[in-house]
C-alpha cells in the first residue's frame, strides 16, 4: 500500500489499466456463465463498462488505499489486508455494476443474479483484484510499490 500523497499519474494509469482489464474478464465470465446473459449482452455490458471503469478506477484506488489503512489500524496482518480489499471491492463496485447492467437492458432478475453472484464471487475476486492491482502498480513503477534497481 502506498503512502497517502499527491496525485501520481503512474498510480492513476496503473489503477485504470488494472480496473479495465480485470473487470472486462471477470465481468464477462460472470455475466455469461453464471447470470445467463447472452454473449451480445455481455459484450455490450463490458464495452459500456470500459469508460465507466476508466472514470472510477483512480477513485477506487484511493478508496481502496483508505480501506487498507483502516484495516491496518485494526491489524497489520495479511488477513486484515485481504478483508479490507474484499470490503472495498464489494462496496465500491456493486452499485456501479448494477447501473451498467440496467443501462444495457439486463432484466431485473439478471441484474439481481449478476450483482449477487458478483458479491459472492468477490469474496475471492476482491482479494485477487487487490493482488492484481498491486502487481500493476509495481509494473507501472508507482512510488511505494517497487524497488528501483541500483
Curated annotation (Swiss-Prot):
InterPro entries: Ala_export_AlaE. This is L-alanine exporter AlaE. GO terms for molecular function: L-amino acid efflux transmembrane transporter activity. It comes from the Bacteria. It is a multi-pass membrane protein. It comes from Aliivibrio fischeri (strain ATCC 700601 / ES114). The chain crosses the membrane at residues 17-37, 48-68, 86-106, 111-131. GO terms for biological process: amino acid export across plasma membrane.
Amino acid at each position: 500500500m502506498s503512502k497517502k500523497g499527491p496525485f501520481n499519474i503512474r498510480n492513476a494509469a496503473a489503477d485504470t489499466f488494472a480496473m479495465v482489464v480485470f473487470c472486462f474478464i471477470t465481468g464477462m465470465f460472470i455475466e455469461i456463465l453464471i447470470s445467463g446473459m447472452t454473449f451480445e449482452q455481455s459484450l455490450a455490458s463490458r464495452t459500456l463498462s470500459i469508460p465507466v471503469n476508466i472514470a472510477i478506477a483512480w477513485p477506487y484506488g484511493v478508496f481502496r488505499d483508505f480501506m487498507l489503512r483502516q484495516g491496518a489500524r485494526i491489524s497489520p496482518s495479511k488477513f486484515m489486508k485481504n478483508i479490507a480489499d474484499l470490503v472495498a471491492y464489494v462496496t465500491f463496485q456493486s452499485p456501479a455494476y448494477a447501473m451498467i447492467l440496467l443501462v444495457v437492458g439486463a432484466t431485473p432478475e439478471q441484474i439481481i443474479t449478476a450483482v449477487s453472484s458478483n458479491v459472492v464471487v468477490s469474496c475471492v475476486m476482491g482479494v485477487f483484484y487487490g493482488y492484481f492491482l498491486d502487481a500493476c502498480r509495481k509494473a507501472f513503477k508507482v512510488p511505494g510499490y517497487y524497488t528501483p534497481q541500483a
